[in-house]
């Protein structure tokens, strides 16, 4: 299984873009699933320039509704419409963003060709996404308006079966899944082989926290 866990910094300038930097946008690749974190103006242009898979993004997380963090979103959503996207898109953001986006489509007399699902964030410590590999939890930021960071936690991978043990104990295929989950091997003669003799520890789990505009507080350290 792929162990991809990579962040692409698409923009990092504060408040306004500069001649060299765009405002806040990041793309996280985890096991070839792509998560967009904030979407400032120029985001889709930068993604094209960086040859990032813009159409593979299915989940967008917006920290707050100051323009330098979301003003590129409407353009990206319209581009998805024009490019014929049909796959559902999930958008996580504080209250208010759905109204803004729906207004943009309404006044231009467009209806998106793909489903958009808005998930409104009200508080920190809220798990907003989970799949077989990762969870995403909100973090309340200290800012003038409702603002949230997002903590991506990788789930613990299954244990790795040792090739020598697989051959030595002639492990049946139907027991491999249980052994990778940490269970011991029970042989036909009743012998119990401890799991630690059969497997190796998996790689350590990783995490990534996207914390945007905020005042300092020690609660973020954990």
Where are these regions (language model features)?
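Generic structural signal for residues in well-ordered beta-strands
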Residues: 7, 116-118, 136
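A glycine-rich helix N-cap at a beta->alpha junction
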Residues: 109-121
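Active-site metal-binding loops of divalent metal-dependent hydrolases
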Residues: 12-13, 65, 96, 165, ...
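Active-site metal-binding motif and surrounding structural segment of the metallo-beta-lactamase
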Residues: 41-92, 120-122
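Short helix-capping segments at alpha-helix termini
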Residues: 82-85, 108-112
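Metal-dependent phosphodiesterase/nuclease catalytic metal-binding core
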Residues: 122-222
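Structured loop/turn residues at beta-strand edges in well-structured enzyme cores
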Residues: 2, 52-55, 114, 132-134
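Conserved beta-strand hairpin/beta-sheet module of binuclear metal-dependent hydrolase folds
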Residues: 2-50, 86-88, 150-152, 159, ...
